[in-house]
């Protein structure tokens, strides 16, 4: 559906932009140094305004003094095929630094929460647990944190996925060709028409690949290296909060997966335990991106949960 959306397009670093959607109050991050920010990053194939619920968050967040900004990274649209979580992290840190200081704000006046959808959830977890760069996020929110590897198993079969992994390792990684783009004929059933490097293919489809954070067959030791490693907020003794919001009817999760049990495993792994938000949960009736095929209550539940979370962060 065609539509126009009022807002401000920020060039947060050379050739990369972020779109600040402006609500009814017309208050912006530039005009108010105390205004807090929900920085949103989508999943594979997403770009500006491609996740349907983002626009629905603008006015509810505006009413409690928050702005929502959707960030474009080098991995947006089809860029993910030759990208990595490390490159995404560098882009996201540049965006956080930009918005932390725009309009004369600083760390003491502006609070920032990073929210990721789908593979954007990997960006959130990487930022909070593995990044070597400073952490100025008071919280991370992962919506539809799903396993890309298990999604590949679901749609292409476990054996075919393993065959692809073995072939890529033998023909590319073992020969030092990890940055080379794979032949379309070999990967189109997995990645469509997106040019995909050997490294990114392995990141997404191999057991314990660099993107393999949310698979149900990972061990407690695996989760301890990610969920169990939340970093302190820079300049503080406090740690960032982590909120996990799974979709009840997520089409990219196998019907045989017990989402409630998996969510509990994630949460039980979070360290320090003070970072384990009680607001994590399963969005009732929600599809992967809480889109039109979701139940009517899904979007309302998501908005209410986010409002509750963001209000609680103001007092921290």
Swiss-Prot record:
Task: Show the Pfam families listed in the entry.
Answer: DUF1749
Gene Ontology cellular component list:
cytosol; nucleus
> In its keyword annotation, does this UniProt entry include Nucleus?
yes
Give a yes or no for keyword Cytoplasm in this entry.
Answer: yes
* Cell compartments where the protein resides: Cytoplasm; Nucleus
| An example Gene Ontology molecular-function term | hydrolase activity
Question: What are the protein's UniProt keywords?
Answer: Cytoplasm, Nucleus
PANTHER family given in the database record: UPF0613 PROTEIN PB24D3.06C
- Describe the family membership recorded for this protein in Swiss-Prot or TrEMBL: Belongs to the UPF0613 family.
Q: What is this protein called?
A: UPF0613 protein PB24D3.06c
């Amino acid at each position: 559906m065609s539509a126009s959306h009022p807002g401000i397009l920020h060039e947060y670093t050379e050739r990369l932009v972020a779109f600040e959607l402006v609500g009814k109050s017309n208050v912006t991050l530039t005009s108010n140094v105390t205004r807090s920010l929900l920085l949103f990053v989508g999943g594979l194939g997403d770009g500006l305004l491609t996740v349907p619920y983002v626009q629905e968050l603008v006015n509810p967040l505006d009413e409690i003094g928050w702005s929502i900004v959707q960030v474009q990274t080098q991995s947006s649209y089809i860029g993910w095929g030759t990208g990595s979580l490390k490159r995404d992290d560098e882009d996201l840190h540049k965006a956080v630094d930009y918005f932390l200081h725009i309009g004369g704000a600083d760390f003491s006046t502006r609070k920032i929460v990073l929210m990721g959808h789908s593979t954007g959830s990997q960006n959130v977890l990487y930022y909070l647990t593995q990044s070597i760069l400073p952490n100025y996020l008071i919280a991370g929110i992962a919506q539809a944190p799903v396993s890309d590897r298990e999604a590949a198993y679901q749609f292409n079969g476990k054996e075919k996925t393993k065959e692809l992994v073995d072939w890529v390792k033998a023909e590319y990684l073992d020969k030092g060709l990890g940055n080379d783009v794979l032949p379309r004929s070999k990967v189109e059933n997995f990645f469509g028409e997106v040019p995909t490097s050997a490294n990114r293919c392995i990141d997404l489809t191999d057991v314990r690949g660099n993107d393999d954070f949310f698979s149900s067959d990972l061990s407690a030791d695996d989760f301890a290296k990610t969920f169990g490693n939340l970093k302190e907020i820079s300049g503080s003794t406090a740690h960032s909060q982590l909120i996990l919001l799974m979709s009840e009817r997520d089409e990219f999760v196998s019907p045989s997966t017990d989402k409630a049990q998996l969510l509990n495993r994630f949460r039980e792994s979070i360290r320090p335990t003070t970072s384990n938000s009680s607001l994590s949960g399963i969005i009732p009736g929600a599809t992967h991106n809480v889109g039109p095929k979701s139940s009517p209550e899904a979007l309302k539940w998501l908005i209410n949960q986010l409002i509750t979370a963001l209000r609680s962060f103001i007092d921290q």
